[in-house]
Amino acid sequence: MKNNYKIPWHIRQYVKRELMDYKDNKKLVEKYKSNIAAYKGDTRALLLVLARLKYIETVLDSLNKEDREAAEIIFIDQYTQSGAEIAKGLSKKAFYNAMNKVIYLVAREMDLL
């Protein structure tokens, strides 16, 4: 059975970028939390980052073990398809299926679909 994870290109690109920035955004939140007084004017930015992180974490937590591992290889470790195949043994089909599934589910979680 073929999964239909088709979404508009601009939404796909936006969500993919958010997923690729996940690790950096987590670090940013930790930086804010450790020195909140220094970032008084950026409360809105912090809230937006926290919301996006929550959407992504909700989706990651809902995935089965294989999809979760693939998502971490793709978006957290940021392997290319060929790199993931060589270093992690993730097939091309599994790579793209997991990537498309996670992007679709995050877009849906963000109410972009």
PLM features: residue spans?
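DNA-recognition helix of helix-turn-helix
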Residues: 89-112
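A short pre-motif secondary-structure segment
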Residues: 70-71
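Helix-turn-helix DNA-binding module
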Residues: 77-94
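N-terminal interaction/assembly modules
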Residues: 1-62, 110-113
